[in-house]
Design a protein with these regions (language model features):
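Short hydrophobic alpha-helices and adjacent helix-cap/hinge residues
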Residues: 2-9, 22-180
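N-terminal signal peptide c-region/cleavage motif recognized by signal peptidases
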Residues: 17-21
């Protein structure tokens, strides 16, 4: 009897590990897709004023798990002739003003609320929480019918001196000022 209980406990643990592995794989896939979206957002946008010209395009996030995936996905890619540097940043650090694009995952929403947005005047701001654009962001990811979609606040991008291609904007849900 003890052997049977031990067997079923082992099977239960294995099933839990399998579910955890599947969830981790889905999270990696979602992060990889979002990294690809970020690449294309940057590729099809023009910065009228560079955040800080340093000889490379700097994609930042406070989320090290996302950055691990993004580093792999964006390896040896270029944006406007510049290599991509993926960087871990603290949202309360002055270093965020050196980012061309900042991606804030849902885990860092509370820190985003208190982030000094004046440090990010010419940085493309992308997030994934429902209120991200309302809290000063430019682009927000959301899920619709199990697919990753995005919405853009073009007027907010314009204030940051960033112009996004009309082709990309046509693929998005547009958020107008006051609708946020």
């Amino acid at each position: 009897m003890r052997l049977i209980k031990r067997f079923f406990k082992s099977v239960g643990v294995l099933l839990l590990l399998q579910v955890a592995a599947v969830n981790a794989e889905l999270n990696d896939k979602e992060a990889a897709l979002k990294a690809g979206f970020l690449f294309n957002f940057a590729r099809y946008s023009d910065w009228q004023v560079a955040a800080t010209p340093v000889g490379y395009f700097k994609l930042c996030s406070p989320d090290s798990d996302f950055l691990d995936t993004a580093s792999w996905v964006l390896h040896q890619q270029t944006i406007h002739g510049l290599g991509i540097k993926v960087a871990l940043v603290e949202l309360d650090s002055l270093n965020i003003n050196q980012c061309n694009l900042l991606f804030v995952t849902h885990r860092y929403r509370e820190q985003w609320v208190t982030t000094d947005k004046s440090l990010l005047l010419h940085t493309m701001l992308v997030g994934e929480t429902p209120d991200f654009i309302k809290l000063g962001g430019h682009i927000r990811f959301f899920l619709a019918s199990g697919k990753i979609r995005f919405e853009v606040a073009p007027e907010s991008l314009k204030k940051a001196d960033i112009v996004m291609s009309s082709k990309v904007l046509r693929l998005s849900r547009i958020v107008k000022e006051g609708e946020q």
